[in-house]
Swiss-Prot record:
Ribonucleoprotein as UniProt keyword: no
Protein known as: Transcription antitermination protein NusB
Highest taxon listed in the record's lineage: Bacteria
Entries under Pfam families matching the protein: NusB (PF01029)
InterPro entries on file: NusB-like_sf, NusB_fam, NusB_RsmB_TIM44
Functional description taken from the UniProt entry: Involved in transcription antitermination. Required for transcription of ribosomal RNA (rRNA) genes. Binds specifically to the boxA antiterminator sequence of the ribosomal RNA (rrn) operons.
Gene3D superfamilies: NusB-like
Organism: Hyphomonas neptunium (strain ATCC 15444)
Keywords in alphabetical order: RNA-binding, Transcription, Transcription antitermination, Transcription regulation
Keyword Transcription regulation part of the UniProt annotation: yes
Gene encoding the protein: nusB
GO MF annotation, one: RNA binding
């Protein structure tokens, strides 16, 4: 007999997976490590650790892997969608590397996790944006993700 996890435990595990995915994507960009190597490293040593290295709620490993792999699989489409929301003449490299990772992860969930509502994905990534950035940058992430979500799911 399987026992269902309470909603808030499941929600916390999914939030942990999203945080880990943003961290992994950031690391992949900075070190040029492959998705496979980065996922393996996180699964063995770092999944479930916060930005400062302290333990947080166990992260959902399946969601973590899905987000990272979806970014890799759909990166051209995702980056095109992000670029379409930037000011004319801006390049992706003008964005902070953590912001790029966060926007890519959110976009990947819009593509790969049709079972989740736009509102849930948006709320989770805006919450993460508040963890990393000031209010202005969190509002920027909100606007970009909200517009991308509509287009990526259309």
């Amino acid at each position: 007999m399987t026992q269902e996890m309470p909603f808030d435990v499941t929600r916390a595990r999914r939030a942990g997976a999203r945080l880990a995915a943003v961290q992994a994507l950031y690391e992949m960009e900075q070190t040029e490590k492959s998705a496979r190597a980065t996922i393996r490293e996180f699964m063995e040593d770092r999944l479930g650790l916060g930005p400062d290295g302290t333990p947080v709620e166990d992260a959902d490993p399946d969601l973590f892997k899905s987000i990272v792999n979806s970014v890799v699989e759909h990166q051209a489409k995702i980056d095109t969608a992000i670029l379409a929301r930037l000011a004319e003449g801006w390049k992706l490299t003008r964005l902070d590397a953590t912001m790029r990772a966060l926007l890519r992860a959110g976009a990947a969930e819009f593509i790969a996790h049709q079972e989740l509502s736009d509102a849930i994905i948006l709320s989770e990534y805006v919450s993460l944006a508040h963890d990393f950035f000031d209010e202005g940058d969190a509002k920027f992430a909100n606007a970009v993700l909200q517009n991308m979500g509509r287009d990526l799911r259309a």
